[in-house]
């Protein structure tokens, strides 16, 4: 596939062509997804939920992100590869932020990083961008702030929240972010932010007017069933297919129906 870059994504904003993004955490899935010419693979810290079985994303480490990014990198064919910076990898000091972003790029092979937050982290965003690491912002429902917000809640419904989100988005753009993810933001607010910014917005549960869309791959394939957000559309029921296949395998082994002659060596 033709290689996508940051410039590719920026040009799609200008042309009005929608940007496509999915999360990805491993080599095999990266091969499958990128074979369909997707624009962006995001190694999300959502791997804490869907791959590591954590209750939330807060326990995910930089080493976790590097490990999974390396796996995705080996399977990726052409997509821009972005990796989340996990909780407390950029909040404490600017130096930590740059150091950890550099590790994710140098050791993991990511081509950009993503951070959650607005005006309160713009010094980190600028420092990472100045260090020649492309960076994406993330506003609205920010899973790393679950304890601050008291759970996973739609953000931007009050006038105060609306004004803050717009200011945050503009601050991220001004300090070097090349795109912003908007999660669980009311559709009309996401539309307004998209129209105000020169950089692309990528929506997840934020309506139809963002410049692109992203979903957690395990959600849209029907593999992760612990919880399904309202905004998810399931394009397959892979989880049910796996359960059926495993049941059939167990039954055939117990009945002596597998392996058959064609599955043996002579």
UniProtKB/Swiss-Prot annotation:
It is found in: Cytoplasm. GO terms for molecular function: 3-methyl-2-oxobutanoate hydroxymethyltransferase activity; magnesium ion binding. Keywords: Cytoplasm, Magnesium, Metal-binding, Pantothenate biosynthesis, Transferase. GO terms for cellular component: cytoplasm. PANTHER family: 3-METHYL-2-OXOBUTANOATE HYDROXYMETHYLTRANSFERASE. Belongs to the PanB family. This is 3-methyl-2-oxobutanoate hydroxymethyltransferase. It comes from Endomicrobium trichonymphae. The lineage of its organism: Bacteria, Pseudomonadati, Elusimicrobiota, Endomicrobiia, Endomicrobiales.
């Amino acid at each position: 596939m033709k290689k996508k870059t940051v410039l590719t994504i920026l040009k799609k904003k200008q042309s009005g062509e929608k940007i496509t993004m999915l999360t990805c955490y491993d080599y095999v899935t990266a091969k499958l997804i990128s074979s369909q010419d997707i624009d962006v693979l995001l190694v999300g810290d959502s791997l804490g939920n869907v791959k590591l079985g954590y209750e939330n994303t807060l326990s995910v480490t930089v080493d976790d992100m590097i490990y999974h990014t390396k796996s995705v990198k080996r399977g990726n064919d052409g997509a821009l590869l972005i990796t989340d910076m996990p909780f407390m990898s950029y909040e404490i000091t600017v130096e930590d932020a740059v150091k950890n972003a550099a590790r994710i790029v140098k050791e993991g092979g990511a081509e950009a990083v993503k951070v959650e937050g607005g005006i309160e982290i713009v010094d980190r965003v600028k420092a990472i961008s100045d260090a020649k690491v492309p960076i994406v912002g993330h506003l609205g429902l920010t899973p790393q702030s679950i304890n601050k917000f008291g759970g996973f809640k739609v953000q931007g419904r009050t006038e105060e929240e609306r004004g803050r989100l717009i200011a945050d988005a503009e601050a991220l753009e001004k300090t070097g972010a090349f795109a912003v993810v908007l999660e669980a933001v009311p559709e009309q607010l996401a539309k307004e932010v998209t129209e105000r910014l020169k950089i692309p917005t990528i929506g997840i549960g934020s309506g139809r007017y963002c410049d692109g869309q992203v979903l957690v791959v395990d959600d849209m394939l029907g593999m992760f069933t612990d919880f399904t957000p309202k905004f998810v559309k399931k394009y397959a029921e892979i989880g049910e297919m796996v359960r059926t296949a495993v049941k059939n395998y167990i039954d055939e082994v117990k009945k002596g129906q597998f392996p058959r002659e064609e599955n043996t060596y002579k």
